[in-house]
């Protein structure tokens, strides 16, 4: 049920397990986890129930800064984000913005695509 430019993959793990796996992968690759937003936890605080939904915001200034220098508007989409969420049927998903879509959206040079291309392998490793 992906929107424009969003890649969705099924996870073989629970939301908590997928998030933990992703945190470990980020650390092992030397990436900084800037924030972990627990959307469902925040919703619960105001009396609204929703399935587990967590957003990880991460990156590396070494990879992101050249992109922002080439196309300043990409700063609205950086740091990178991976959403881990559970649908109404209990299936867990890992979602992220397609690097190709971000390139098309912001118009940065093709040679810089590798700076954000790792999001695909990160998501796959966390979901697998």
Q: Predicted regions: what is each one?
A:
Residues 18, 22, 39, 63-64, ...:
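Amphipathic alpha-helical interface surfaces
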Residues 34-83:
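Compact, glycine-rich, soluble single-domain proteins
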Residues 104-128:
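Well-ordered alpha/beta subsegment
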Residues 1-29:
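Terminal, regulation- and interaction-focused segments at domain boundaries
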Residues 81-109:
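Beta-strand/loop substructures that line and gate deep hydrophobic ligand-binding cavities in soluble
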């Amino acid at each position: 049920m992906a929107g424009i430019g969003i890649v969705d993959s099924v996870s073989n793990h629970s939301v908590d397990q997928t998030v933990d796996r992703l945190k470990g992968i980020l650390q092992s690759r030397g990436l900084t986890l800037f924030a972990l937003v627990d959307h469902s936890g925040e919703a619960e605080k105001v009396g609204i129930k929703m399935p587990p939904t967590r957003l990880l915001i991460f990156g590396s200034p070494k990879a992101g800064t050249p992109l922002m220098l080439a196309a300043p508007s990409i700063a609205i989409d950086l740091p990178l984000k991976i959403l881990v969420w559970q649908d109404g049927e209990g299936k867990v998903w890992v979602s992220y913005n397609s690097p190709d879509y971000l390139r098309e959206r912001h118009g940065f040079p093709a040679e810089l695509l590798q700076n954000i291309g790792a999001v695909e392998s990160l998501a796959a490793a966390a979901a697998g």
